[in-house]
Amino acid sequence: MTEWLPRRRLDDLLRRLRSLHVAVVGDFFLDAYYDCDGRLDEPSLETGRNCYQVVRTRRQAGAAGTVAANLVALGAGTVSAVGFRGDDGEGWELQRVMDGLGLCREGFFVAADRFTPTYAKPCYVDRDGGGWRVREGLERIDIKNRRPTPRVLQ
């Protein structure tokens, strides 16, 4: 352990974290990973451009959700999400991920007039033994709310 944080101090902080109720306030994004096999690429009939062929999908909580997931991984007693999602498919996926983490969602709202912020992250993958290895990230697609957050959600 580095000098600025002795091991004993870190152990004490992590032990105390188990008894805390931590609220994470912010923008919760869905990180949507699309693992593509480049050997299966084919041209689009509509545009002639390349169509990436997805062989696996993964979902994770992003942005404030990453902070919440890290607190859970560190053993925080209770982690509450304070924010909102849209009433859309991405929102349901984000909620499923959050529930899988065990986050408290009492302060997490569904807003019908908002998108669930999403980073769609396609990448090329290769087989690596029994699993997959990311070879190259492709162009990301961002879904964000471009209008100010309504007061009722702030």
Q: Predicted segments — roles?
A:
Residues 25:
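Generic enzyme active-site microenvironment
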Residues 1-16:
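Short coil-to-helix leader/linker segments, especially the first N-terminal amphipathic alpha-helix
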Residues 4, 19-22, 30-154:
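Conserved N-terminal subdomain of the carbohydrate kinase-like
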